[in-house]
């Protein structure tokens, strides 16, 4: 969606400084189509992979104008986002607290078409660039002090974030 907004509306795109090269596609830390096809024997994986491909999941375009979200820029944005680096899904992945809401991105999800259950959890390991690091990063989220979680996939979760982290790491 960020690619579309940037191209269509010239929307500025900000992310953690460590994620900027990834957003610009200087490199790509994403599951490969070959790795997905190796999972085709699993229920739902082939259908999901085909749907994602039709929705542009194979597009490798970056966002050339991506800029680092510095504290100075964050101060000028609605909600004044505060960065919580959560590397693992990608090496520069970052979650943000905005207006007392944790926007976790892919650090923690509450549902996914390939997940076996709903509720706080980590993505299947093949979707993380460094799965052990992704799991360690969850501890940082537990300190967010918010009661609302917006995940990268799944429904909004309301409750102590420390509880969400416990469920995700169980």
Protein language model regions, located:
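Short, glycine/charged-enriched secondary-structure capping and boundary segments
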Residues: 3-7, 27-30, 99-101, 117-119, ...
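Short, flexible active-site loop motifs that bind/organize anionic cofactors or intermediates
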Residues: 10, 64, 124
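Active-site metal-binding motif and surrounding structural segment of the metallo-beta-lactamase
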Residues: 1-19
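C-terminal/domain-terminus segments
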Residues: 41-45, 149-170
